[in-house]
Amino acid sequence: GLPCGESCVYIPCISTVLGCSCSNKVCYRD
């Protein structure tokens, strides 16, 4: 539920290594 300050509209979340995932074109963590 916390935004990771990254979008995933065109490319995947680089912050997935930090536990972030793509949701509604924005990377979130929990």
Curated annotation (Swiss-Prot):
One of its GO terms (biological process) is defense response. Keywords: Disulfide bond, Knottin, Plant defense. This is a cyclic peptide. It comes from Pigea enneasperma (Spade flower). Detected in stems (at protein level). Disulfide bonds join C4-C20, C8-C22, C13-C27. Probably participates in a plant defense mechanism. Belongs to the cyclotide family. Bracelet subfamily. This is Cyclotide hyen-G. The keyword Disulfide bond applies. There is a cross-link at G1-D30 (Cyclopeptide (Gly-Asp)). Pfam families: Cyclotide (PF03784). The presence of a 'disulfide through disulfide knot' structurally defines this protein as a knottin.
